[in-house]
Amino acid sequence: MKQAAIKPQITFDDFTKLDIRLGTIMGVDEVEKSDKLMKLTVDFGDHQRTILAGIKQERENPAEIEGLQALFVVNLPERKMAGEVSQGMLFDIGFEDKQLPCLAIPEKPMPNGCRAG
């Protein structure tokens, strides 16, 4: 496998600006106007968010991730896609390396809303 190139160096301050949190995927729904996006309802402990993720073609059954905990970037600006609004980004592994992506998940259950870093 040829790995993706390492991205340009960033400062530690740049890294600390990312707010990556653990959430439980409570729902996985179709986005009617997209052949790639699925709408995830994610529980972050003190609130829920809608996050659009391009997983429709990556998984035989996208709903299989319902109930799993995963990492999400939560401090991106809201983004409208295919008539829906996304309030963050799913943090997955493999896409940049042309691999079938998988979720970044904790090795044991942790409270929703916990920060990665």
Language-model features, listed with the residues they occupy:
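Phosphate-backbone binding interfaces of nucleic-acid-interacting proteins
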Residues: 1-117
